[in-house]
Amino acid sequence: MFAIEKHFSKFAKFCGLKTSAERGYDPMEETMKALENDTMGAKPLSNSLLYEFGEDSSGVVFSKDSIGCWFEIAPIVGSNDSIEKNLTLFFADELPEGGYLQFLIVASHDVSNILDMWEKGREHGGEELNRLTAYRRHFIEGLASDFSNADDGRLARNYRSFVTYSAKDNGEKGVEALLKFKKKLHNKLRAENLSPRQCTANDLILIGRDILQMSMSKQSKPKYNVLNNLSDQIALPFEPNTIEIDQITHHKSGLVSKVFAPKELPESFCLAEMINLLGSDYRSIPGRFIISYTIANNLGAKGISAMNGAGTRSIHAAEKSYTKNDLVAQEEARQWVEVKALHKRGESFLQESMLVMLTAPKEEIEIAEEVLKSLYNTNDWKLEPAKRIMRIASLAMLPMMQYSYWKSLKFFKLTRYALSGEVVAKLPIQGEWRGVPTSGALFIGRRGQLFNWDPFFRIGGGGNYNFIVIAPPGAGKSFALQEVAQSMISKDVAVFVLDIGASYKNICKLLDGEMIQFNHQCNISLNPFATLAESGAVLMKALQMIEQRIDAEEIQLKTGLSFERIEALKIGKSGASAETKESDGIEILEIKGSDELGNIKTHFVTKDSIIYAKAMLSTMCGVNGDVRGEAIIERAINEGVVKYGTRLDITKLRLVLGDLKDGKGEAVEGASRFADCLYPYTEEGTHGRFFASGADASFKKMLTVFELEELKNDEPLLAVVLQVILMQITMQFLCGDRSRRFMLIVDEAWLILDFAASFLERFARTVRKYGGSLGVCTQDLTSFSNLCGTRKSQAAILECATWKLILQQTADGMAAFSASDSYKKHVPLIASIRKCSQNKFSEVMINTDGATVVGRLATDAYSTAMFSTEDTDFKFLMQKEREGLSKHEAIMALSKKYGTLPDLAPIRNRSLRVNNI
C-alpha cells in the first residue's frame, strides 16, 4: 500500500501537483529536521552501549560480540604477601587466552546502602533516637556529597570493588569456557578471603549509570526487565551530556567527568601501596573517582614469540662492539635478561591498561584534578587526561567492556606489555575496612569509607563482646562512649554506665534513663544475693529439656532463654575443657541443706554467680588471692543460700561467717575476722544503706547511669559498689529478662582497677555467655600492665577484650605502648591518631583479631550538643532549663553552636517514599 502511495506521489510531483494532502511538504521529514536541530544532532547514549541482556541464574552477561561475568569483592585491608604470590600464579596459569580481567573500584558518594543497614537496625529508643537517626543520616549524606569541603577530613564514601571478565562470544563453547573460568575465579577470590558476590543485571544498571550518568540526588533502585535491551535500561533518557576535548559535561547534574591514563609509572610498586591512590591519611580527593585496571592474555603464541625475539635481539645487540659503551643499550639488554628469566620461571607475557575517572561539580573540577594529580605524583604516578578520546575511555571503563574496546585503547597507546608478576602490584583491590554487617556506631575511615562498629559482632565467630577504651582526658572518650551507648540502646541493648563526673547526664535525661547518684541522699539498696538462690532454676529446667533431646526452639519458647544461652548450657554439660566451659559454657551447681526451720531445701545456682559473689566478698574482706580465705567465703555463701534462700543479704552473710564451724564443731579460724570486715556493709554499718535487704533494686530503663563522683575518694568502697552493681545487673538478666543483651560501661576504671581486678577479670571472661558486653575505660595502657608480676588480673582484663579502642595519646601514653610487646608494631599508627583541632571529628583506632583500622567519629549538630562534656555547654543547658525549656529544647538551642539542623518532616517523608519504591 505504502509503495503505491509513493509511486502516486512521484507521479503527482512529475505533473506539478502538490503532495501530502496538497501541503507541498512531508510532515514527518520536517519533524525529523526540526528534531535534529532541537537536539543538535544528539543521539541516545544507549546507542553507544554494547550490552544486550544478562542472565542472573548463570551470572553471564551477553554483549555485542562478547560475553562476560563479574563479582563484587571485599577489599584487602593492610598488607598481604601471600595474595601477591597466589594471584601471580593464577594469572600465569589460569587466565584463559583471549581473556580480559578487569579490576574496578568505585569511590562512590552514594552511602545509602550502609545507612539503610544502619537505620534498619535502629528500631528502639523512642522519639529522641528517631530524631537523632534522621539528623545523623542527613548529616552523613551531606558529608558524602560535599566535595568542596573534602579537606576537612569528613568526606564519607562507599568504596565498591569489582572483578570482571570478558571474552569473545564463541557461541555455546564460549559460554561453557566462560562458566568454567568463572568457577575458578570465584574459588580463587574466595580462597583469598575477598568474599566474592556474583553480580546481577540490576548491579550492572546501577554501576553503569554511576559511571556514565552520575547524579548527586538520591536515585531509586533499578529493576532489570528481561523484555528490554540491557543497554537501554542502563542509560537514562533526558540526561544530556557533551563530550569535549578533555572532559564530559553532564548538563542536568552540573557535574563534569574527566578520564586520565598514567603517562609514567613508578619504578617499583607493591600491592600494599595501592591504598595510597585512594587518598592520603590527611587529604581526600574532592570528587567521585573510579579506577579501572585491566590485564589481557591476548598475545597468543605468535605474540609471545615476537616478544622473546625482541628480547633476544636486544641482548645480542648489546654484545656487539659498537654498543659496549652504549649505556642505554646495555640497560635495555639487562632488563631483557631479567624479563626472559622471569618468563622462563613461569611468568606470562600479558598486556595491561589503567584508566582513572574523576567526577566533580563543574566549578570544582579543576581543584579536584589538581589534588588527584598531586596525589598520584607523590606516589610516582603521572596522570594525563585522555584528550579527544573521552567517550571511548569512559566506555572502556564499564564492566566487561574490555574485550570490545581493547583495540581502540591499544591504538591510542593506552595499553602496555607486562609480566604476570608485575601486574599484581597494580591491582586496585586495596581498600579500607568496611566494618561489621550490623548496625552500630558510625565511623568514617581516613580515606572516607563509612562503616559500622558493633562490639556484639564477632569477626570470624570467635572472641567475646568486651571492649577496652584507652584515652587520656580531653581525647573525646566520654563523647565516643555516648555514641556507643545510644547505638546499642537503638538496638534494644540495655546499657549501664558507671560514671564519675556527670558526663552522661544529658543523654540519660533525654532518653528517659535512670540516673542513680551514690551520695548521702541515695535511698537505693543493692542486694545481688537475693536472686542468687534462684539463679539456676530456669537454666536447670532448660538443661533437663536438653537431656530429653527437646528441640532448641521449643526450649526457647518455654523458658525464654536465648539460643546463645541454650548452647552455653550444652557446653557446660559437655566434656569440654575447663577453659572452654569458663568462657563459653554455663554450669549449674546443686546446693542442698537445711534452712532456718530445719527443712531440707535444694537450690540450683550457676557456678559463675557463686564465683562472682566470692570475688566480691573477697574484696570486701581483703582476701583476694588467699586460697584458704576464699574457700571460707565460698562455704559461707553456700550455707547462706541454703539457710536464707532469697532473703540472703550481706548482713545475714556476716552472721553465717561468724557461725561457721569446722568438722570438730569449733569456730573456723579466720571466719570471724572476715565477718568483722563485712560489718561496714551491713545494716548497722557506715555503708549499710547501699546494701540493705528488702529494697531490692531493679533497673528497667534502657539506660541506667550510676554516678559515683562522691565515692571517688574512697577507692575501696568504690570498688565494692562497682562489683555489687555489676553482679546485681548480671543476676537481673540471668533471672529476669533472659533474652535481652546488656552492656556495662565502667568509665574511669583506672581508679578502682587495682581493688576490683579479680572480680572484673572473672566477669570479663564469663559475661558473654549471658548476653553481656563489658566496656572498661582507662587513661593509658599502664592500667593493665603486669611488669611487676603481681597484676595478672589487670593484664587478663585487657586480654579478655576482643575489641580495643584507642584514642589520641599523650607522650606518657605513647611511652607505654612503645614498651608493650603486643603494641610495638602499632606504635606509628597509634602516634598518628588525632582529635581534630576544630572538633570536627575524633579518630579512634579499632583493634581486633583480623582488623586494625582508624575511624573518625563525626557527628551532627544535635548529637554533638547532646554528647558535649564542655563546661560552657553544661552551663548553657542548665540556664536554658532554668528559663523553662525542656531538655530537648535546650539541646536544640545548643546545637546552633555546632551547625544547622534541617527540618525533619520533609526528610522523613522523603525517606518513607524511597523505602516504598
Label each region the model flagged.
Residues 449, 455-475, 479-487, 495-504, ...:
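Conserved P-loop NTPase motor cores
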